[in-house]
């Protein structure tokens, strides 16, 4: 008999969203997941599955039953010939990497945070950068999913293909993802090179940068022309690191947090802070090399609010210059650094922000120094307006103000996804307030 807990308070990593589920379950087997869903049907309860809790939105929140998949975290099979690995959906990427290392395998692309579950990564459309690479879910070759009625579907391109096309970005609303099979590549090392540039230079030579580096991204420092360009590419170099406690923590975290807190009383400081920290930390070339997963992952030190929309790649320059012009025209609107700009190959996953188009993701951020919220509404709304103007689609895990009407315009396959969702979960067991805004 599956055991549930009362009185559990759930908070996401950034402590920006939370909820009090009526019951909190940590199943250890498929049978126990089935028991939870049977109880939910009997008592007419909503169910949400939660992974690492990193989503900066209320996508995982519920006052019904919450299922934490952390105890279903095994590697089930490694197929060395096909270079594929099958895992339980609750495994954290941080725990998967050393297992893949043992077999000389790696994932070809990863997001910045690995303290997340495989089921959650695909559910929210997690991405990184590189025009040869899709969002992380494009590495999924098969999955199993338990429907609201307790039956299990095996999904791949050759079995339940429609559900597979939807479930690779499932939003937690199709069922409980039980297992995922990932396509891997041989283990590889990456060399990361970062160097200073200007916004004009990077936008004028965007195609050249995209061709030069397999995993290219750049950071723009609002209220300035400053840019840090980051290349990541395959290497045979020995592992080396450019990290340094004094610069990374004493300056890059403790001093920055204090100055950002000060700027909540003196907002005009923000532009100066952005320029000062570019000069301190990003004004020279740096190199580091290591196993791919150690280079892809970096430590998020700050609690934060973020938005991250995907626009057609060819609109990058126009959209970024419009964001810059908006900030120049409204000096009272302040923006923390960086605006992170990444690039992703198009795909055929129904609710992927990169559905049928190569995309540019433009991530904006406002930190919460010492847990204090900084006024961001004007910046947020102006950014959303610009993103919508250029055909943007918001990252599913991150907060946004879009509703069904918006998604119907953004996603050619939106109605197809809705039909699949209604077939798999006719009573709406897996919905919550976030998803009701999406679908109703």
Swiss-Prot record:
The keyword Flavoprotein applies. SUPFAM superfamilies: FAD-binding/transporter-associated domain-like. Oxidizes L-gulono-1,4-lactone to hydrogen peroxide and L-xylo-hexulonolactone which spontaneously isomerizes to L-ascorbate. Highly expressed in liver. InterPro entries: ALO_C (IPR007173), FAD-bd_PCMH (IPR016166), FAD-bd_PCMH-like_sf (IPR036318), FAD-bd_PCMH_sub1 (IPR016167), FAD-bd_PCMH_sub2 (IPR016169), FAD_lactone_oxidase-like (IPR010031), Oxid_FAD_bind_N (IPR006094), Oxy_OxRdtase_FAD_BS (IPR006093). One of its GO terms (molecular function) is FAD binding. Keywords: Ascorbate biosynthesis, Endoplasmic reticulum, FAD, Flavoprotein, Membrane, Microsome, Oxidoreductase, Transmembrane, Transmembrane helix. Signal peptide: none annotated. It comes from Mus musculus. Residues 17-187 form the FAD-binding PCMH-type domain. Belongs to the oxygen-dependent FAD-linked oxidoreductase family. This is L-gulonolactone oxidase. One of its GO terms (biological process) is L-ascorbic acid biosynthetic process. Pathway: Cofactor biosynthesis; L-ascorbate biosynthesis via UDP-alpha-D-glucuronate pathway; L-ascorbate from UDP-alpha-D-glucuronate: step 4/4. The gene is Gulo. Its EC number is 1.1.3.8. The keyword Endoplasmic reticulum applies. Its main location: membrane. GO terms for cellular component: endoplasmic reticulum membrane. It is a single-pass membrane protein. The chain crosses the membrane at residues 251-273. Its cofactor is FAD. The lineage of its organism: Eukaryota, Metazoa, Chordata, Craniata, Vertebrata. It catalyses: L-gulono-1,4-lactone + O2 = L-ascorbate + H2O2 + H(+). It is found in: Microsome membrane; Endoplasmic reticulum membrane. The modification Pros-8alpha-FAD histidine is found at residue 54.
């Amino acid at each position: 008999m599956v055991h549930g807990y009362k009185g559990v308070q759930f908070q996401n990593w950034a402590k920006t969203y939370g909820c009090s589920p009526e019951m909190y379950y940590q199943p250890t087997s498929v049978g126990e997941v089935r028991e939870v869903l049977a109880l939910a049907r009997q008592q007419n309860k909503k169910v949400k599955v939660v992974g690492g809790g990193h989503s900066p939105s209320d996508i995982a929140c519920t006052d019904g039953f919450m299922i934490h998949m952390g105890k279903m975290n095994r590697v089930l099979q490694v197929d060395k010939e096909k270079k594929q690995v099958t895992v339980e959906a609750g495994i954290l990427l941080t725990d998967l990497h050393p297992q893949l290392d043992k077999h000389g395998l790696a994932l070809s692309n990863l997001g910045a945070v690995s303290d997340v579950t495989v089921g959650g990564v695909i559910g929210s459309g997690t991405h990184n950068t590189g025009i040869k690479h899709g969002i992380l879910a494009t590495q999924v070759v098969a999955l199993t999913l338990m429907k609201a009625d307790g039956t299990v579907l095996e999904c791949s391109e050759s079995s339940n293909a429609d559900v597979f096309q939807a479930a690779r970005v499932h939003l937690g609303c199709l069922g409980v993802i039980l297992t995922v099979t990932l396509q891997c590549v041989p283990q590889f090392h990456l060399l990361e090179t970062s160097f200073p540039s200007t916004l004009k230079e990077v936008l004028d030579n965007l195609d050249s940068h995209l061709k030069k580096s397999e995993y290219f991204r750049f950071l723009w420092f609002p209220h300035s022309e400053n840019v840090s360009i980051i290349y990541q590419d395959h290497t045979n170099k020995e592992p080396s690191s450019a990290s340094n406690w004094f610069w990374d923590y004493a300056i890059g975290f403790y001093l920055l947090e204090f100055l950002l807190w000060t700027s909540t009383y003196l907002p005009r400081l923000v532009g100066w802070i952005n320029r000062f920290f570019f000069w301190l930390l990003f004004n020279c070339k740096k190199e580091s090399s290591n196993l791919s997963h150690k280079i892809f992952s970096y430590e998020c030190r700050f609690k934060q609010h973020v938005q991250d929309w995907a626009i057609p790649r060819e609109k990058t320059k126009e959209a970024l210059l419009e964001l810059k012009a908006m900030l120049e025209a409204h000096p009272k609107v302040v923006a923390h650094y960086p605006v992170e700009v990444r690039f992703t190959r198009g795909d055929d996953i129904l609710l992927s922000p990169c559905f049928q188009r190569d995309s540019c993701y433009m991530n904006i951020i406002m930190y919460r120094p010492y847990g204090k919220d900084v006024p961001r509404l004007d910046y947020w709304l102006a950014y959303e307006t610009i993103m919508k103007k250029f055909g943007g689609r918001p990252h599913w895990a991150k907060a946004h103000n879009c509703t069904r009407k918006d998604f119907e315009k953004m996603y050619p396959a939106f109605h197809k996804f809705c039909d699949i969702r209604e077939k798999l979960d006719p009573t709406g067991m897996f919905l919550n307030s976030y998803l009701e805004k999406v679908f109703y």
